[in-house]
Every structure is written in structure tokens, then in C-alpha cells.
A protein has these predicted regions:
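Metal-dependent phosphoesterase/phosphodiesterase active-site architecture
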Residues: 40-120, 191-230, 235-273, 277, ...
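Active-site environment of divalent metal-dependent phosphoester hydrolases
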Residues: 58-61, 126-129, 171-182, 240-242, ...
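N-terminal secretory signal peptides that target proteins for export/translocation
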Residues: 1-19
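Well-ordered, non-membrane alpha-helical segments in soluble/globular domains
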Residues: 142-158, 192-197, 260-267, 323-330
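Core catalytic region of metal-dependent phosphoesterases/phosphodiesterases
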Residues: 73-183
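Active-site-proximal segments of metal-dependent phosphoesterases and phosphodiesterases across multiple
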Residues: 241-264, 274-341
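Bacterial N-terminal signal peptides
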Residues: 23-33
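Active-site neighborhood of phospho(di)ester-bond hydrolases with catalytic His/Asp-centered motifs
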Residues: 51-53, 116-123, 164-174, 283-286, ...
């Protein structure tokens, strides 16, 4: 609305000679309100990156609509889903239904309508997707199921594209994103072949993109905003400790035994090329490196075992995210190219977390782990916006979350709020490895930092507080990338308490 039009609306009797003064008096408060509603200005930031993860969309949340969805083109799905009489958002312990998905995507647009780039760090499909489909449709024909999976992927892509029409949207596969079930994605397999066109169109790239998506579920592309910055997307499902088990239990997937080493070789070549071309690199992937702190703490009860327990029993309870060989080699690559790799982005854990990698010093490596949209693990749905500088370094980030999950639906809209801005909440100058390492140290020594970390970890959810006995296991995962490093923090430490994470 123009100044004159706003004046006529707000002060219709205003004399023309007073319009300039009136314009200032009327619009200055509006400008101040608008500035307050948006994100805070970032130091030297030139663009914003929108990151979402772990949607785990379940189009079958209302079983009465499934037959129509099966028969329809993805372009017709929204009309069908809008007919659902189940109006409530998915709640804690559930994957994302249509109402939550729509609300989350709309909140992303409101928070940042024109990001330089959108990243989705994996897991489009709901947990137990094959089982749910079979239980509702009673259709055991593999071709029918695969068609429904592909329609689901295409529908999510359509919804993202509808809201971010002119923006590159980058996907990376999650462990649930496959026809054959969890952790069973295959190099050159049917799922990667069938989704290549969708992933390429979202990324607004050409055929070279499709080739590496099909073969490895990975790709390399130039940053759309920053000259001299490259983005490498890695299908880290191949490196998962659970990938080998899945490959032997899903006979519908043809597993390439060399996929993990092929991916590492591909990464090493791309990093070498980037260094030679004087490019900087962002990495994105689904499963982060290091130790699964949640899985580790649950089978090993430190309280019942005593203060420190048996070192042997503690060590055997440690659950790695990746096969140790791939973790060690990845760690070595990050150390070798620490001046090239500027940041890494991951998902998978559903919580707001981070990893600090390598020794102290310049260019400390780190991984930002993005919160999930799905509230299945009792955290609040969330997403983040990252501000980056012209040289590819990160200035800051702001996390948004759904504040009224259990009450949203029907006439009650979802209330998405800014949860925190990194530099302000943690009182650090910028988003980098040094700041994250400082926070890691403060969590161990200051109760206020520890409590803040735990609060943000669950995206401000109080649905399932973290037991005191589990805190140290989660804390040690921040810096304990390898199993020996994690054990030295977790297994040899005193039982966690208020003074010791």
C-alpha cells in the first residue's frame, strides 16, 4: 500500500500539505512493527537458507481417503486431503498428517518468503510406510505400492514448489525414503531411478545431476547465490551401521556392496576438485556422523549399574550412527579439507542438535542437526533459517517451532513462533565451530547452559523430558565422533547430575 493510500485510510481528512508529516507519523510505527516481526538483521549476511527435515508425511492418516489418493494424480491430492474429517494436527508420537504439513510449509513461507536456497535433509516418508499401506489397502502388489510411494514424494515436491516457485530446493534421501523399507536404499535401485526427475526439477539442474542421484543418491552443484561455493549432498544411508542389516532382510532391494566406498571415493574427488578450484563447500546429508546418543543411553541404565558401571558393558552399549570405518575416513577427510568445508547440515535425530568435529583451532568443523517437522519422538515440529555471508561462512540461524501442537486443527490455527536466534540466545558472535565448541564447554560447567541446551534440544517441548540418567550420553555425542572418543567421555565419567552432563 502506498503512503498516500495508507494516509487516506488511516487519516482521511488529512490536508495535502500535511501528507509528508502524516506519512512519517503513520508509517514509521508500521515499519518498526514490520522490522520486529521479521528476523533480526544479521552481520554482513547476504542471503538466507531455509532448512527443513524429517517431514515423515503420512497421507494415510485418514484411512477413508486412501482409496481416492491411490486412484488420483498427485496434483489432485490436496483437494482430496482437504476433505478429511480428521481435523486435528498430528500430535506427539505421530508422524505428519496433511494439516501439519500444510501448516509447516505455510509457516516457512511466512518466516522467509524468498530464501536463496531450500534444503530438505531427508525422510519424506512416514515411518512404517509399507506396513500402513498394506494394512489399509490389503494390496500386496509391489507395483501398486511403489506407485503410491512415488505419488507421495511427488505430492510433497509439488507443495514445496508451490510455495517456493523460483527457489532451488535440494533433497537428500533419508533412511525411510525407499520402496523396500527402512535403511534399504540401493545404488542404481528403483527408488533412486524413479525419483531422479523429481529431485532434479526441484534443484533446477540438468542431466549430470540425475546421473549421480541415480547411482549414489548424491550430487554436486554450485551455490545459487555465492560464487565459489559448492554444495555436496551425500546419501549417508550407505554409511549407516544399520544399512548392512537392512540389506540382508529386504529381498526387494539389490544392494551394491561397494556403494559405501564408492560414495566416499566420490566425496574425496569432489573435495579435491573444490580445493583445486579454490571453492568452498557446504555438505548436506541425512544421518550425521558420530554416536547415536539416544540409542546408546536406552539399553544401558547407568543408574542401576552404579556410578560408572562396568567399562566393558558401557562400551558394548555404544551405538554408532555410521560404520566406524566410514566415520574414521570421513573425519580424516574433514581434517584434510578443513579450509575447504565451511559447514555441514544433517537431520535424522529429529532434535535440535550439533556436532563439533576435530581439534581446536581455525576452521573447526561442525554439523548442524536440524529439528524435524514430524513430532513422533515428542519434540515440537520445527525448522530453521540460516543467514550466510558472501564468503560462504554462516552468520547466524533462527529456529521456528509450532507452539500449540496439541490444540491446533480445525478452527484453531497452528501458532508458529520464533524459538530463538543462535547468537542472541547463546551470546556468541556468529555461527561457527568455535562458537559451538564454546557452547559445548559451557554445557558441562554451567547449569544454565545445560538447561538451555536441553530445552532447545526438544524444540521447547515438555511432552517427554529427558531423564537425568540419559543427559551425559546425549552430551558426549556432541564431540565424541568416534567410538573411542565417545567412550572416553561417556563410559569413564561420573553418573550425570546437575553439575555434570
Amino acid at each position: 500500500m502506498s503512503c498516500a493510500a495508507e494516509i487516506r485510510r488511516r487519516v482521511p481528512d488529512c490536508h495535502p500539505s500535511s501528507r509528508l508529516r502524516a506519512c512519517i507519523l503513520v508509517l514509521l510505527p508500521l515499519l518498526l512493527i514490520s522490522a520486529a516481526a521479521g528476523q533480526p538483521a544479521r552481520k554482513n549476511a547476504v542471503g538466507r537458507l531455509l532448512i527443513a527435515s524429517d517431514v515423515h508425511f503420512n497421507p494415510m492418516a485418514d484411512p477413508s481417503l486412501v482409496a481416492d489418493l491411490v486412484a488420483a494424480d498427485p496434483s489432485q491430492w490436496e483437494t482430496i486431503l482437504q476433505r478429511s474429517k480428521v481435523m486435528a494436527f498430528s500430535s506427539y508420537g505421530q508422524d505428519t498428517n496433511w494439516w501439519l504439513l500444510r501448516s509447516a510449509l505455510d509457516a516457512m513461507v511466512k518466516a522467509e518468503p524468498h530464501p536463496a536456497l531450500v534444503m530438505f535433509t531427508g525422510d519424506l516418508l512416514a515411518h512404517d510406510f509399507p506396513k500402513t499401506y498394506q494394512s489399509i489397502t490389503h494390496d500386496s502388489e509391489p507395483g501398486h505400492y511403489r506407485a503410491f510411494v512415488l505419488k507421495t514424494v511427488d505430492f510433497i515436491a509439488l507443495e514445496f514448489r508451490k510455495r517456493f516457485a523460483a527457489t532451488k530446493i535440494l533433497l537428500t534421501p533419508g533412511n525411510n525414503d525407499e520402496y523396500c523399507g527402512d535403511y534399504s536404499i540401493a545404488a542404481n535401485g528403483a527408488f533412486l531411478l524413479d525419483t531422479a526427475e523429481t529431485a532434479r526439477d526441484l534443484a533446477m539442474e540438468g542431466e549430470p545431476f540425475s546421473a549421480t542421484w541415480k547411482s549414489l543418491g548424491s550430487y554436486s552443484l554450485e551455490h545459487p547465490k555465492l560464487h565459489g561455493v559448492r554444495i555436496l549432498s551425500l546419501n549417508t544411508i550407505f554409511w549407516s551401521d544399520q544399512y548392512r542389516a537392512a540389506s540382508s532382510s529386504h529381498d526387494c532391494a539389490t544392494v551394491n556392496a561397494t556403494a559405501a566406498s564408492d560414495l566416499l571415493t566420490w566425496l574425496e574427488l569432489r573435495l579435491a576438485e573444490a580445493e583445486q578450484a579454490h571453492e568452498k563447500v557446504w555438505l548436506m546429508f541425512h544421518i550425521p556422523p558420530g554416536i547415536d546418543g539416544w540409542a546408546t543411553t536406552h539399553p544401558y541404565d547407568r543408574t542401576s549399574a552404579g556410578t560408572s558401571g562396568s567399562a566393558a558393558s558401557c562400551a558394548t552399549s555404544v551405538v554408532p550412527m555410521w560404520v566406524p570405518e566410514w566415520t574414521a575416513r570421513f573425519d580424516s577427510l574433514l581434517e584434510r579439507y578443513r579450509s575447504t568445508v565451511l559447514a555441514s547440515f544433517a537431520g535424522h535425530t529429529h532434535v535440535d542438535d550439533f556436532r563439533v568435529i576435530g581439534a581446536d583451532g581455525a576452521n573447526r568443523q561442525f554439523v548442524l542437526i536440524d529439528p524435524a517437522i514430524s513430532p513422533i519422538y515428542d519434540q515440537n515440529p520445527g525448522f530453521r533459517i540460516v543467514d550466510f555471508r558472501g564468503d560462504g561462512t554462516l552468520a547466524d540461524q533462527t529456529t521456528y517451532f509450532l507452539a500449540n501442537l496439541t490444540r491446533a486443527g480445525g478452527k484453531t490455527r497452528g501458532r508458529w513462533r520464533r524459538e530463538y536466534t543462535f547468537s542472541r540466545r547463546w551470546k556468541v558472535p556468529q555461527l561457527d565451530g568455535a562458537s559451538l565448541a564454546k557452547i559445548y564447554d559451557e554445557i558441562a560447567t554451567r547449569n544454565t547452559a545445560r538447561d538451555l541446551w536441553l530445552h532447545l534440544y526438544l524444540v521447547s517441548s515438555s511432552a517427554a523430558p529427558i531423564p537425568a540418567k540419559d543427559v551425559r550420553g546425549l552430551y558426549c555425542a556432541i564431540s565424541g565422533l568416534t567410538q573411542p572418543g565417545y567412550e572416553s567421555c561417556y563410559c569413564a565419567a561420573a553418573a550425570p547430575g546437575k553439575q555434570s552432563p
